[in-house]
Regions:
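Single conserved hydrophobic/aromatic residue that forms the stacking wall/gate
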Residues: 1-8, 12
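Internal active-site segments that recognize and position negatively charged phosphoryl groups
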Residues: 10, 14-18, 22-25, 46
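Short edge beta-strands and adjacent turn/loop segments
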Residues: 22-37
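Intrinsic disorder
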Residues: 3, 34-35, 40-42, 50-53, ...
Length: 154
């Protein structure tokens, strides 16, 4: 079953690359809860897309294709050019910058719409930030994180 998942994920990813007309080679590694796929090649910006939306879509489709009809779920994590780590660092910097402004001006700030994972990164980055709290508002796909002034909050 695991071998079938591996073959299925590689086929799905290669089909996506062909459809996007991008030459990329998937390097697949076994991780603790599934597979990690690192895409290697040139011009991977088309695979990443705006704020990682295309990469997220490829990952979601691959997970669906591999797990459809299977009794045991396997998680496929896909990255290209280290995008996911770079995005996480960028979100953490944004969170701290916004929190500083919120405390300085004592006024809440609402961030741009983000997916659930990106909102989680913001919440986690600020969980111990003094005088600030975070919460999400709105409905997908326009759900946003609010960084709120909360005096005395730790």
């Amino acid at each position: 079953e695991i071998r079938l998942s591996l073959v299925g994920s590689e086929m799905c990813i290669r089909d996506s690359m062909e459809h996007l007309q991008v030459e990329a080679v998937p390097d697949i590694y076994v991780s603790e809860n599934g597979y990690k796929v690192i895409l290697q090649g040139r011009g991977l910006g088309a695979i990443i897309g705006r704020r990682g939306e295309t990469l997220d879509a490829i990952q979601q489709l691959t997970n669906y294709a591999v797990n459809h009809g299977q009794s045991k779920r396997v998680r496929i994590h896909i990255d290209a050019e280290g995008y996911r780590a770079k995005r996480e660092e960028s979100l953490q910097r944004l969170a701290v910058k916004v929190a500083g402004k919120v405390v300085k001006y004592r006024k809440n700030m609402t961030l741009e719409p983000m997916n659930a994972y990106e909102r989680h990164v913001i919440h986690a980055a600020l969980q111990d930030y003094p005088n600030v709290t975070t919460y999400s508002t709105g409905v997908e796909p326009n759900r946003r994180t609010v960084v709120a002034y909360a005096p005395g909050q730790k």
